[in-house]
Amino acid sequence: MAHDPGRVLIFDTTLRDGEQSPGASLNLEEKLAIAQQLARLGVDVIEAGFPFASPGDFNAVQRIAQQVGGEQGPIICGLARASRGDIKACADAVAPAPRRRIHTFIATSDIHLEHKLRKSRQEVLAIVPEMVAYARSLVDDVEFSCEDAGRSDPEFLYAVIEAAINAGASTINIPDTVGYTTPAEFGALIAGIDQHVPNISEAVLSVHGHNDLGLAVANFLEAVKNGARQLECTINGIGERAGNAALEELVMALHVRRRYFNPFFGRAEDSPTPLTGVRTEEITKTSRLVSNLTGMVVQPNKAIVGANAFAHESGIHQDGVLKNRLTYEIVDARTVGLTDNRISLGKLSGRSAVRARLEELGYDLSREDLDDAFARFKELADRKRDITDRDLEAIVSEQVQQPDARYQLKLVQVSCGSSLQPTATVTLLDEEGQEQSEAAIGTGPVDAVCRALNALAGEPNELVEFSVKSVTEGIDAMGEVTIRLRRDGQLFSGHAADTDVVVAAAQAFVNALNRLVAGSLNPTLHPQRDATPLDASPTL
């Protein structure tokens, strides 16, 4: 049987696979903020990125290893294709972390071997032990993944896994890369590996999966029943295409249904010992942080963290909940950290109160960033009576969004009405602090603003999404705008919040433009789609 650590290890890949969501690119400070919150959440492993992809990715993984990795903290992991260049870059990036891991992979399905790698099974069987052994010579903790395991021939899969373990892999990850399998099939796949790989007792079995058919969480729970003890997941389930298995859903399923899962761990059914090391009261805070920084809105009916997850509209349900919450709620909202504000903030609140509340929300700002955030807070407090946590999150997420921005929005003015041609004038500051102004007309005030900004920036792009939502309730609520721009097949997101939605739209557009410029200057490799160095030689 596979090695059993006695509980489920949570491997968070929000910063790697989650960031591969279209338009969800994060800068260094945003990645660091999320990594710090993941450590507070109590995940076992943080996959901080793909270091070989670009200098920016390398630096982000290295900074996270330096500032988040610790003797008592999470393992800091980097992804590497099965090639020496990738693996060496990964080892160098995670080196500052006392607890570090290299996660290397190669495809094992015939369709990937034929059309992507152009390798035979024999060639892959030669590459795997060589590259795993090389990784093991650089770090003590190596994870190996069989990409597209769900569509791989079982006998070949068993042989690859056995070779990887013999070469030094201590974790074997089984990905359902395209979200194709059903729970019964995935459970049988894990059980087959557990039964047919002779040295599987030397490694922890891990699973990774995508939600293309909406089955990722169900597949993972079935895998746990069949011996998987590490789950690779993301906050809010973000990720490529339909996303990854959602961390919050997996953790809470194991928490709420502990009596059901305990026997699969050799425990008494009523054992109170948690099945994961996650601090569930940090879940809501982490979800909001990731949503704010990526600009990816959580759907209202999303399990555990959606706005409606604990809302009751039916009169019968409301009556039952008022009498006893257990009548219609299987999860106490407080268990996932959904509580009322403990500090009421307003125009008379001081810097210390704001800093304390931001720290509770998971933001550890530098002195300079705190000064800027406090100035924004005071400005908002002059227009809004009560400042909520969501308002603070909106302020700070915008603050950390563009630390090295090419453009800064200085002024936006619009003129519009039922009998007026919508006109906008905008002023930008460039990197040298020089002001540039432009005016434009459009079909509406936001269109006019975007046209003026495009004229100033001169960066070709296509606006593919504009959305606005209320951050909180009330007529004085802030409006949060998300904008996505597309260029050369890539999406770049920007978001901003203001009590004036036109101003918020202008700032969001500028933030998206800055990401577009940064992305053009620092292109990155995709770990699965881009050609790998091993295509040239199996010994690289």
UniProtKB/Swiss-Prot annotation:
| Record key words, sorted | Amino-acid biosynthesis, Branched-chain amino acid biosynthesis, Cytoplasm, Leucine biosynthesis, Manganese, Metal-binding, Transferase
What is the protein's major site of localization?
A: cytoplasm
**Cellular component aspect of the GO annotation:** cytoplasm
What's an example Gene Ontology biological process for this entry?
L-leucine biosynthetic process
Q: Which reaction does it catalyse?
A: 3-methyl-2-oxobutanoate + acetyl-CoA + H2O = (2S)-2-isopropylmalate + CoA + H(+)
**Region ranges (Regulatory domain):** 408-540
What InterPro entries does UniProt report for this protein, alphabetically? 2-IPM_HCS-like, 2-isopropylmalate_synth_dimer, AIPM/Hcit_synth_CS, Aldolase_TIM, LeuA/HCS_post-cat, LeuA_allosteric_dom_sf, LeuA_bact_synth, PYR_CT
Pathway(s) served = Amino-acid biosynthesis; L-leucine biosynthesis; L-leucine from 3-methyl-2-oxobutanoate: step 1/4
SUPFAM superfamilies, per database record: 2-isopropylmalate synthase LeuA, allosteric (dimerisation) domain (SSF110921), Aldolase (SSF51569)
A Pfam family per the record: HMGL-like
Residue stretches making up the Pyruvate carboxyltransferase domain: 8-269
Q: What class of enzyme is it?
A: transferase
Domain of life, per lineage: Bacteria
GO molecular-function terms, A-Z: 2-isopropylmalate synthase activity; acetyl-CoA C-acetyltransferase activity; manganese ion binding
Role played: Catalyzes the condensation of the acetyl group of acetyl-CoA with 3-methyl-2-oxobutanoate (2-ketoisovalerate) to form 3-carboxy-3-hydroxy-4-methylpentanoate (2-isopropylmalate).
Concerning its family, UniProt says: Belongs to the alpha-IPM synthase/homocitrate synthase family. LeuA type 1 subfamily.
User: What quaternary structure, including any partners, is listed in this protein's UniProt entry?
Assistant: Homodimer.
> Mind telling me what this protein is named?
2-isopropylmalate synthase
Please report the organism this UniProt entry assigns to the protein: Synechococcus sp. (strain WH7803)
Q: What is the lineage of its organism?
A: Bacteria, Bacillati, Cyanobacteriota, Cyanophyceae, Synechococcales
The gene that this protein is the product of is leuA
